[in-house]
Curated annotation (Swiss-Prot):
Subcellular location: Mitochondrion inner membrane
The Solcar repeat ranges on this chain: 184-270, 278-363, 375-463
Keyword presence, Aminoacyl-tRNA synthetase: no
Annotated GO biological process: ADP transport; ATP transport
Name of the protein this chain belongs to: Calcium-binding mitochondrial carrier protein SCaMC-2
InterPro entries, per the entry: EF-hand-dom_pair, EF_hand_dom, GDC-like, Mit_carrier, Mitochondrial_sb/sol_carrier, Mt_carrier_dom_sf
Amino acid sequence: MLCLCLYVPLIGEAQTEFQYFESKGLPAELKSIFKLSVFIPSQEFSTYRQWKQKIVQAGDKDLDGQLDFEEFVHYLQDHEKKLRLVFKSLDKKNDGRIDAQEIMQSLRDLGVKISEQQAEKILKSMDKNGTMTIDWNEWRDYHLLHPVENIPEIILYWKHSTIFDVGENLTVPDEFTVEERQTGMWWRHLVAGGGAGAVSRTCTAPLDRLKVLMQVHASRSNNMCIVGGFTQMIREGGARSLWRGNGINVLKIAPESAIKFMAYEQIKRLIGSDQETLRIHERLVAGSLAGAIAQSSIYPMEVLKTRMALRKTGQYSGMLDCARKILAREGMAAFYKGYVPNMLGIIPYAGIDLAVYETLKNAWLQRYAVNSADPGVFVLLACGTMSSTCGQLASYPLALVRTRMQAQASMEGAPEVTMSSLFKQILRTEGAFGLYRGLAPNFMKVIPAVSISYVVYENLKITLGVQSR
């Protein structure tokens, strides 16, 4: 007779037996043969429940909330294939063994810095024969029915650029795991991210339009406040006017995201890194270049967004009418007004956003990632909000100058200005504070934008067949 038992090794702890796998459809006398018994201490029951739920969700094909024997065997086979891919990605030397240096290198590539002692501690937990290296059998035996603590899990749970949309698509693209690339899940993540961005931008569009108005029209002599700005917009064009410019802002998500992702993947190959995931500085370079390519491709849409947000009632009948009138009156060059400060703003925004997010991620993983790399909703939202806020704060003066240059030609009697002359003019007439006009509504929309995009992203993932967090 066969019996499958898993024992979690514990020393000197009160243990309780739990059985939760049985084979349905078998004669009653055989049901006890195919079972899984797990012995765990009572104080670790919460960890056990999370672990059980993860395994059941992964293998439950008929969605009845439990695994029968056939589903369990299928889960083991499928999970072993995934573990093989992870093992190969960690085995930098291709010698069939993983040592402490390879563990440190793999985590360092993701921005997670650990000491050699910490790497050796991880190694010892899996090393059965005391060689201070892990072969495939040791790796498989440890992880097959053990809470996962691996590189793909960190990538899976800590996606940032794909999930959060605060209206400025200047973040460094996310990495995808080997499995996500091979199964085609990557494009589902991008579609979910695009849909989340569309909903998020639409919900926060009134604050975004107010920011643009304050960037262009607010000054010492015209001290526009938030309440006054909303009142002015509603008085001029009614409640619908709060969403002016939102259509083009949503429309540009798809081409910009697609171009940036494709450019990022090509630049990764040009960098020539043999790692599956890039190091932090390589990600910054590749992400900034990809962002520059994407922004260059869709920049006329950025100009249209600003002009549509600033338009008066009846000025344009729609986006195409706006584009035709700009082309006829100002020429093709008008569609690239503010291009230089926009490009210069990519590096501080992307660099600081990435650095802050990776620092917060690393701090959390070092301190709290005991059984899983899953940070939970609130930690993820907090990290995304803080990193986006810091990135925007650093690049905001360039964003303000860009917006004023985009709007300048549409203002009657406005002289032609350059980036440097506009900086000097603002500093001379308004001081350093003038470079941060509209910052308040911009920051006010960060938390709702991040929260809305996260909720919509998670729901769209389920709809598109991506395994939920």
